[in-house]
Structures are given as structure tokens and as C-alpha cells.
Amino acid sequence: MQQNKVDLPPVRASGALLSLAGVGKVFSNGVTALDNVDLAIGEGDFVSLLGPSGCGKSTALRIIAGLSLPTSGTLEWRGGSFDRSGIGFVFQEPTLLPWASVFDNVWLPLRLRGVSKAKAAPAIMEMLSRVHLDGFAEAVPRELSGGMKMRVSIARALVTKPRLLLMDEPFAALDEITRFRLNDDLLSLWRDERFTAIFVTHSVFESVFLSSRIVVMAARPGRVFEELAVEAAYPRDEAFRTSPDYAALCRRASDVLSAAMQANGGGRDDGH
């Protein structure tokens, strides 16, 4: 079924928001996590890093976030520098403060920037509404499902209005129906908030549904194997998930992922 087009963030014509050139990472134990990675991320892009375990997807995110330094190569931001306070990060584990309310968990990054609870309240309540957690502001994490905890984590990452959102397999531990709903909501947030997104995943299906571009990585050492443009209009919904176009894009991405895994001597990855 043909998808209705919507306006996307003004992207790709404006050039890369960030570029990795020849980036390598060798850990202290001698393991090479990344080798000569070249990657450009356009402002407004939704890019998935897809690949088997050990291909350096998470390491690349940490380097971009400034949580790890590359052993070699360069990371360049458009304009020469980038305030990393403009980066949001969503991890696989929600990492919520167990004793704090949902409201206070989302307030945390604003609190660390000196924003009072009263001043932050409108932005927090708006973001909780955007992630469908109306009525849960005073709940604590033990009262929430896994999917709801992830919604809190997404709200916390986006409440500061980041320019770049990094996500490290955020939905991997959730059931398929919850993942579908979160994928739908994440795309809605991406369109409305107009941030750039880098999404790490093992799932072919998830990467095709979400992304404007997929970067398939190979392991041992971690490197870019091939980049795929996802030529499908937004918005993407249940009709897109059941369309022949989606099935064809998934087959193509799966074939490239299989080739990448063969390039590093086999290994297993179920595409999820």
C-alpha cells in the first residue's frame, strides 16, 4: 500500500552533522573493536547500525557520545564542534532511579542543568504525554511494565530537546507487540521533535521499519560492510509492515547481513 508522504527534517542537502573518518578502537586487552570506520550522519537522518554481536555497534555509539575515545581516526562535527549536552542516550536497560517517581526520573537531566522542578514541570508533563504515560507521573519504577520503563527512559532522553539521540538496542528485551508500539511512537517523536537518530539493533525488521538508512557492520574486527538506503516514504505504519515493499526491503537487508556475517567467518544472528 502506498504511504502518504510527510515533511521530514531538512537533512541531507545540508551535509553531515557528524563524520567518522578512519575510526579505530583497540581495547587494553588487545581486542580490536573497530577498524577504519568511515561513517557520515546527515542532520535529521534516522540511521540504524545493524550487525552481529562483536561488530562494534555499541562502541561506535560510545565514541560519538564522548564516553570512549578512539584509538585512531577522527570524529568531526559540522561547524567544528558540538556541545555534547545536545546528545540524548537511551540504553537497553532503562536505568531508572528505583526510589524516584516517573516525574523525578524524567526531571533528572534538567535538574543536573540547574532547572528547578517547578520550571521543568511543563516540559516533563508534555513529554510524558508524548510517550503515552499520562497519569503515571507519581508512579515508581516497580509499578511499571518493561515497556513503560522504556517509555520513561525515552522521555528522559528527549526532555532536554537533544539534537542527536543515540539508542543502544533499547527494545531488545521487550516482546514483539510492545516493540511494534514503541517503534511507532519513536517514529512519531522523530518526525515531530526533528532530532537526528542513531539506533543500534540486531533486528532486520526493526531497522527497515525505522530507518532512512541502514549501516550493516561486520565483526572481527568491527567495520562498515555496506550501507543501504531504505527507499520508503514516511509515515510508516501497520500497512507498511504488511506491504510487499517492506518484505522486499527486509529480504535485501537480511541478505546483506548474511554476507557480512560470512565475511567474518560465519557466526550466528537471528535477525532479531
Task: Annotate each language-model stretch with its function.
Residues 65:
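Helix-to-loop junction immediately C-terminal to a conserved catalytic motif
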Residues 107, 111, 118-136, 188:
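Conserved ABC ATPase "signature" region
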Residues 154:
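Hydrophobic anchor residue at the start of the ABC signature
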